[in-house]
Regions:
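A generic structural signal for well-ordered alpha-helical segments
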Residues: 51, 93-96, 315, 339, ...
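Glycine/charge-rich, flexible interdomain linkers and switch-proximal surface loops
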Residues: 62-72, 101-119, 257-273, 280-283, ...
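P-loop NTPase catalytic phosphate-binding loop
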Residues: 16-20, 107-112, 116, 134-260, ...
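Low-complexity, intrinsically disordered P/S/T-rich segments
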Residues: 1-165, 216, 356
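Short, intrinsically disordered, mixed-charge
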Residues: 49-53, 87-101, 185, 189, ...
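Charged, low-hydrophobicity low-complexity segments
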Residues: 1-60, 265-266, 276-278, 397-435, ...
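Conserved alpha/beta core segments of nucleic-acid transaction machinery
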Residues: 378-474, 478-506
Length: 506
């Protein structure tokens, strides 16, 4: 009987769903502007002249014009040391009177030395030009993302499932949020709501607010939440823990189905070779986008880093992918664990070379010209891309177009994390009290001063034990919470009320 059944169609519930149309995107009348040949020839002359002044002869020079940058490739004469040319970066920039140039010596796989010079009047790369391109329309990636145009004016498209996670960094106002919007927009143009869900985490509160209209189509959230876009830090921890739970559940289903990846699993499910009664279900990809990750680390620290590292390490096979953006690429935010698991990096302009090294493991991001100019690193090779520009009104039009259509009844529900998992690892069990507990309580009440060092001195015990005693006193309501370096408040004023409390605890 199973042979007669037709293939399962995940899109069946929303078979009437129409993808956003291309006319929702703004067309900028930059057109294919004619290449400014005079500027190009002038720059060629200046480069040759500058190098000649320092005694470096070159055999050939050719220019490739991109939307914001022109790349001049030179071949030096035999016997010229590359390091000599690399050291002349500032001199060449001076003679070209350019904002800042970048020398790539040598160009990987080309046998030339590249000099990147910003154009006098840069072109806008519109999202429309990238999404209407033949390459994007015809690509059959699992999660295709059209980022923008490379230096040769080709559209740059990558598959998020191959990445598998992406780290975005750059100083304020250099185009990070636009980059994230470009990623989300290109996914919305290619993926049906049944095939992809997104978890949007936005500590800035305003960046992703636009996407709340597509909640019932594309977003995933905790079951009892009102808002699908997560802005509250405590909720972020719950959501991330819930995602790790979803990841473990998915791995179990994969194990039962004897497959290795979500792709194989879904193919098997579509062919109706997995029984839904045994808990099998079609799995959509889940893309987690976090804007301003540094803010989360500063407020919640390890609690957030742990689940992120876990998801980053294991979740690629079950179709969960993360895109994390931060404007502070310092080492205490982008830690080693996170770096190891985010092989693909997008670097917008940063201020210092150290920041650039933190993101890309090499300098270069500090020499970009800003406004969507970025380096995309995947493994060892760096690609310079002009990020496609998405305007807020454009995103709004797209989300409204999707939001007006019939969606699912609710947003995709993530598994609930039970209360026991939320208990802090250092939680206090009052049945397992320290033998000195009652004496310490009397001491604190007599002195009316809740300080750990007082307990240490009087009972001559170590800091750790005194700290645990303090936690137990706090749990039983004798002292208040810690307030940095100030002593804790003592809630019980006299020994008589303390004895009553201790009797009730015994």
């Amino acid at each position: 009987q199973t042979d007669q059944q037709e293939d399962y169609d995940p899109r069946k519930d929303l078979s009437s769903f129409r993808f956003p149309t291309l006319n929702l995107l703004k067309v900028y009348n930059t057109g294919d502007r004619a290449v400014n040949m005079s500027e190009q020839n002038e720059n060629k002359e200046k480069i040759i002249h500058t190098l000649r002044n320092y005694g470096i002869e070159i055999t050939s020079i050719k220019a490739t014009v991109g939307p914001t940058i022109t790349l001049y490739e030179i071949v030096p004469q035999a016997g010229v040391r590359i390091s000599k040319i690399r050291n002349l970066e500032d001199d060449i920039a001076l003679s070209l009177s350019a904002l800042g140039i970048r020398i790539i010596a040598p160009m990987p796989g080309k046998g030339t030395i590249g000099i990147e010079v910003p154009n006098k009047d840069p072109q806008i790369v519109s999202m429309q030009s990238v999404i209407t391109s033949k390459r994007f329309q015809e690509c059959d990636y699992d999660l295709p993302v059209a980022l923008g145009k490379t230096i040769t004016n080709e559209v740059f498209i990558f598959d998020l499932t191959k990445m598998p996670h992406l780290l975005v960094a750059g100083a304020t106002g250099q185009g990070k949020s636009v980059g994230l919007n470009a990623i989300i927009t290109s996914l919305l143009y290619k993926k049906h709501p049944s095939e992809m869900k997104m978890v949007l985490i936005d500590p800035k509160m305003v960046e992703f607010n636009i996407y709340s209209t597509i909640e019932k189509h594309y977003l995933a959230k905790l079951p009892d939440e009102q808002k699908a876009i997560i802005t509250d830090v405590t909720k972020v921890t719950q959501t991330l823990n819930s995602l790790t739970r979803e990841m473990d559940d998915r791995y179990e289903l994969l194990m039962k189905a004897h497959v290795r990846t979500i792709k194989e699993y879904n193919e098997k499910f579509v062919k109706r070779r997995l029984n839904p009664e045994k808990g099998h279900k079609y799995m959509p990809y889940i893309v987690v986008v976090i804007d301003e990750f540094g803010d989360l680390i500063m407020t919640a620290g390890k609690e957030i880093e742990m689940p992120i590292a876990r998801i980053a390490q294991k979740a690629r096979a079950v179709g969960m992918h993360m895109v994390i953006a931060t404007q502070r690429p310092t080492t205490n935010i982008i830690t080693g664990t996170i770096k190891a698991n985010f092989p693909a990096r997008m670097a917008f302009r940063v201020t210092s070379q150290i920041d650039s090294r933190t993101i890309l493991d090499m300098s270069g991001a500090n020499q970009l010209i800003g406004r969507g100019d970025m380096l995309f690193s995947q493994g060892s090779n760096l690609i310079r891309i002009q990020c496609a520009f998405v305007d807020t009104p454009e995103v709004e039009e797209i989300t409204q177009y999707i939001g007006k259509q019939h969606g699912y009844d609710n947003a995709f529900a993530l598994p609930e994390v039970t209360g026991e998992a939320e208990a802090v690892p250092g939680a206090v069990d009052l049945n397992d009290r320290d033998p000195l507990f009652e004496e310490a309580a009397r001491l604190i009440v007599v002195h009316q001063q809740g300080s750990t060092s007082l307990i240490q001195r009087k009972f001559s015990i170590g800091y750790n034990r005194a700290g645990r005693l303090m936690d137990q006193l706090e749990a039983s309501g004798i002292v208040g919470a810690a307030q940095g370096s100030k002593p804790r408040d003592v809630f019980i004023q006299d020994e008589y009320s303390l004895e009553k409390l201790l009797n009730s605890l015994r």
